[in-house]
Amino acid sequence: MWRELRRLGAVQLQQGTWAVPGGEGFDAGFTHVLESITAAGGHPVVLAVADDQASTSRLEALFTEQREAEWAEFLADCGRYEAELAGEVAKGKLTLAELDEEEQSLERLRRWYRTIRARDLFGVPGATAAERRLKECTEALEQFAEQVYQARDRP
């Protein structure tokens, strides 16, 4: 269940206790998690957060911290992706098969970006850097593709 909760954008407060954002895009997934827990013999308890500023601020900080960590991991993966492209160029591995593999890796980064963006409720600063880095990765792949096609045209 914890994987599904994380996928929803939930934050683990302590063992077995999670904070889940409410609203469109979250409610259906949360209902599914509750049903799955019940079907497995569990007894989920749902509590609404008190509407006081201190609790709201603390929860927002927890969600922001988690999203920043995800964006940092995403940015690190972007760096690894660009390093992989540079390594293939350095090795002269300019093949269509390699291009296909790198296109799949970029698509994985795009999916991951969309996933994090969907659960980034507060628009943390890391999102802007992530968007920029994803564009840079796309440009790097375009340059790699150009090199692959140029290599194919050489006798």
Pin down the residues of each PLM region.
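Positively charged, polar, low-complexity stretches
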Residues: M1-A86, C137
